[in-house]
């Protein structure tokens, strides 16, 4: 609901004495606000993003796109106190067209699917809109194609393997520790078995590979499946567990004789990703090319 601002005006003393007069007008959203379109708005993370963007300073929700719940008010779908008067639509192009006519700064958040993300960013770019992409399992060749597209169009795009600031801090701590320990194993738990090892686990293993360190020299065998999967050529072992009911958890164990260093991070709720998402929105509007990884802005 728009806020109402009331301004009082005292009449000049040179005129006839009179009571003060006032006028009221419903305030409109600032023209400087970042207009945000959420593609995949009906998903759990999309709904959390709707709430976060609506409450954030300097940005406003301009569109909700999804193939499910078409026609429903996105505010009511997200259990907000009042409707946002923004219906869910299935046509991204229609929303992009309405925003681009106002020549306002716009960002499309993409929570969709690896198979559609390139076309989504291409459409957003054609309408002069920046993109934030959080699509697990996105292929490296897709990222390369997006990078070429953004370079040609001089348009910003942020591809984020994770929006979790805690996860990024864990990865940074792991890289630092890898220079001081020769033994490392990663244990993760996920509520479902959609992707194992998870993209995050693979990224952590890749981050600490090719740093001139060979890990777990005394147990380099890959014959025993119970010892986990070796990722990369430097011996990083990953153990993946599927435990419904528990939070998504990542633990990295480093050890040397008489010393164990453990780094752990849990994601209990999708809302934990929202600070990272809002940071991504604020940073991508200044970009003129593709940047891979939210950690570039921490």
Swiss-Prot record:
The keyword Ribosomal protein does not apply. Coiled coil: none annotated. Its main location: plastid. Expressed specifically in leaves. It comes from the Eukaryota. GO terms for biological process: diaminopimelate biosynthetic process; lysine biosynthetic process via diaminopimelate; photosynthesis, light reaction. NAD(+) binds at residues 160-163. It holds the Pfam family DapB_C. It is found in: Plastid, Chloroplast stroma. One of its GO terms (molecular function) is 4-hydroxy-tetrahydrodipicolinate reductase. One of its GO terms (cellular component) is chloroplast stroma. Keywords: Amino-acid biosynthesis, Chaperone, Chloroplast, Diaminopimelate biosynthesis, Lysine biosynthesis, NAD, NADP, Oxidoreductase, Plastid, Transit peptide. The keyword Amino-acid biosynthesis applies. Residues 1-25 form a transit peptide. Disruption phenotype: Impaired chloroplastic NAD(P)H dehydrogenase (NDH) activity, probably due to a reduced stability of the NDH complex. Belongs to the DapB family. Unlike DAPB1 and DAPB2, DAPB3 is unable to complement an E.coli dapB strain. Dihydrodipicolinate reductase (DHPR)-like protein that may not function as DHPR in lysine biosynthesis. Required for both formation and activity of the chloroplast NAD(P)H dehydrogenase (NDH) complex of the photosynthetic electron transport chain. May function in assembly or stabilization of the NDH complex. This is Dihydrodipicolinate reductase-like protein CRR1, chloroplastic. The gene is DAPB3.
């Amino acid at each position: 609901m728009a806020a109402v601002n009331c301004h009082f005006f005292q009449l000049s003393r040179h005129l006839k004495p009179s009571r003060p007069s006032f006028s009221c007008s419903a305030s409109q959203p600032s023209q400087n606000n970042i207009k945000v379109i959420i593609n995949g708005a009906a998903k759990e993370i999309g709904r959390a993003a709707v709430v976060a963007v609506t409450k954030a300073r300097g940005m406003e929700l301009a569109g909700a796109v999804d193939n499910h719940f078409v026609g429903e008010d996105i505010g009511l779908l997200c259990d907000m106190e009042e409707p946002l008067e923004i219906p869910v639509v299935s046509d991204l192009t229609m929303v992009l067209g309405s925003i681009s006519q106002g020549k306002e700064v716009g960002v499309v958040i993409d929570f969709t699917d690896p198979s559609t993300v390139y076309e989504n960013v291409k459409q957003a770019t054609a309408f002069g809109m920046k993109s934030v992409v959080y699509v697990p399992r996105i292929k490296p060749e897709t990222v390369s194609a997006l990078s070429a597209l953004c370079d040609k169009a001089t348009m910003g795009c942020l591809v984020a393997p994770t929006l979790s600031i805690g996860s990024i801090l864990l990865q940074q701590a792991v890289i630092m520790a890898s220079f001081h320990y020769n033994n490392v194993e990663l244990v993760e738990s996920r509520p479902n078995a959609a992707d194992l090892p998870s993209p995050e686990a693979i990224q952590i293993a890749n981050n600490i590979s090719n740093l001139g360190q060979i890990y777990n020299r005394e147990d380099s065998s890959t014959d025993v499946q119970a010892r986990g999967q070796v990722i990369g050529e430097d011996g990083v072992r990953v153990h993946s567990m599927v435990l419904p009911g528990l939070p998504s958890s990542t633990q990295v164990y480093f050890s040397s004789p008489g010393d164990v260093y453990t780094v752990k991070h849990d994601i209990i709720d999708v809302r934990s990703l929202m600070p990272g998402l809002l940071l991504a929105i604020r940073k991508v509007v200044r970009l003129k090319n593709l940047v891979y990884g939210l950690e570039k802005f921490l």
